[in-house]
Amino acid sequence: MKKFIILLLSIFLAMSLAACGNKTDSRDSSGKTEIKDAKELLTTVWNSYEEDEKFAIASGDMTEENMTEDAPGTFGITDADELDRMLGFPAADAEKIDNAASIMHMMNANTFTCGAYHLKNADDVKSVAADLKENVMGRQWMCGFPDKLVVISLDDYLVSVFGNEELVNTFKDKLTQTYENAKVISEDGIV
């Protein structure tokens, strides 16, 4: 009987440790989540997807060094108009970020487009989030309309995702489960 209880407790301990090992929400002494850059943030979320939840993606910007398939990619921030055109990030706010990354549906960007942005100053999160929402909601869409836009903050990072409602909801859920600090700032249907 003692051996059985010890075996049971050992299995329980092993399972508990394995579950804790899947959490990536490590924080520094100030309570901020430790994230190296926007690409790492998106990669961590993308890697939390089960294989049957994933879809074909092309990521990064159109430069040879940043263009990626099947994984999040770095998006250059030097061309503010390209940030706006491809990700919906307002060109006027490009000077407020120092790092960006993206994930886009390979067949149609309106099906799923996600951008992650590191803000130079965390105090700008609310104003940039409002500008981003206004910029995406005010677009003229071609090749189909996205269903939904979600903007999420994570310390000094902003993440925006728009597209098919099911894909957007899955991403939002994965991000908020992976990073306990994540806060949904806005969640709107696109009309």
What are these regions (language model features)?
Residues 21-113, 119-191:
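Soluble, non-membrane globular domain cores that form compact, hydrophobic packing
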